Amino acid sequence: MSQATFAKELTAKFAQLWTEKTKRPLPPVNQAMMQRLRQGQRQSGPNEVFSRVSALFRDLSLIPQSFENAELQDMAMEILPLDRLYSVAEERAEEEGERDNWGLQDYLIMELLRWFKQDYFTWVNSPPCETCGENGNVQFVRRENSTPEEQKYDASGTEVHQCSNCNTEIRFPRYNDLSKLMETRRGRCGEWAKCFAFFCRALGLRTRYIWNAEDHVWSEVYSERRKEWIHTDSCEEAWNSPTIYSQGWGKKMSYVVGFSGDGVTDVTRRYVRKADQQLPRTMVPDEQFKTILNSITSDIRQNLSPSEKEELKREDEAEERELASYNADEPQEAQMPRQSGSVEWTKARGEGGSDD
């Protein structure tokens, strides 16, 4: 029996614990929707800035659509340690579920976080020297355009590092292609977040890719048990710790936006709870910002049935009530400082802790 076939049987075993909404797969690649999103990139708005911001978010909205590729999902099923993930999740759900109010799928993602961080993906400050194998003596020297071969795997640029031992230059392409990420299994925030979010979706879970204007990305998954979106960050093995960035890292943020197969949502208030943690939101006026996100969401949901649209509208309204409920004066749990990345790198990004 292939791993992919085993995955389907194992998922079916727990199907009764998933809602029909969760089990309903999106089309492998919804070409009509992707065409609408791309057309929206070229539409004019109130001004040039509005158009550029709209194009940026329409481009980002294509990322979760790429998670629906059936061939890539089959590749993921061959990689994921499904028996182990489900066994641990089932055991924890039986032992801790009632007390902690988490469901099987929540424990599944908790275990996926642990496996992804500890056993699967590797963080790269500088890549090891390919000639002498040195790790500690390799330093970044420049960034340059990716080669045609690197561009085949959607490299967004290539870093060049140099070994001080042997002077060898090592290329570190910043790949975005999911098949390549499953091959290289390494990177920084972008590679980690995209590959982890894809694995969540490959397991059949509703997943968001979370973009932050201050150069960090992570993910959220929808908890069917709690009926809410839950923060996940594979770089930190973090579960349901949305204030980790503002409290633990000392990171100030302006925009935090979630992209899923169901729409686009401004989730800044989940992650920024206090005025002194909020950077100015100056991309476009807030009303225009809402218009951009609503337009993209409308395009994504265009072909859904009236009942599906109504269900998502109810979810949107419930999430809006949740986000509006956060009290800036309420005590916040202490959070860990950033674990991933070198000290110099995190400090340069303003993520070295609240005393940075």
UniProtKB/Swiss-Prot annotation:
It comes from the Eukaryota. Binds 1 zinc ion per subunit. Its cofactor is Zn(2+). Zn(2+) binds at residues 129, 132, 163, 166. SUPFAM superfamilies: Cysteine proteinases (SSF54001). SMART domains: TGc. One of its GO terms (molecular function) is peptide-N4-(N-acetyl-beta-glucosaminyl)asparagine amidase activity. The keyword Cytoplasm applies. Residues 307-316, 346-356 have a biased composition (Basic and acidic residues). The keyword Transmembrane helix does not apply. It catalyses: Hydrolysis of an N(4)-(acetyl-beta-D-glucosaminyl)asparagine residue in which the glucosamine residue may be further glycosylated, to yield a (substituted) N-acetyl-beta-D-glucosaminylamine and a peptide containing an aspartate residue. Residues 300-356 are annotated as: Disordered. GO terms for cellular component: cytoplasm. Specifically deglycosylates the denatured form of N-linked glycoproteins in the cytoplasm and assists their proteasome-mediated degradation. Cleaves the beta-aspartyl-glucosamine (GlcNAc) of the glycan and the amide side chain of Asn, converting Asn to Asp. Prefers proteins containing high-mannose over those bearing complex type oligosaccharides. Can recognize misfolded proteins in the endoplasmic reticulum that are exported to the cytosol to be destroyed and deglycosylate them, while it has no activity toward native proteins. Belongs to the transglutaminase-like superfamily. PNGase family. This is Peptide-N(4)-(N-acetyl-beta-glucosaminyl)asparagine amidase. It comes from Yarrowia lipolytica (strain CLIB 122 / E 150).
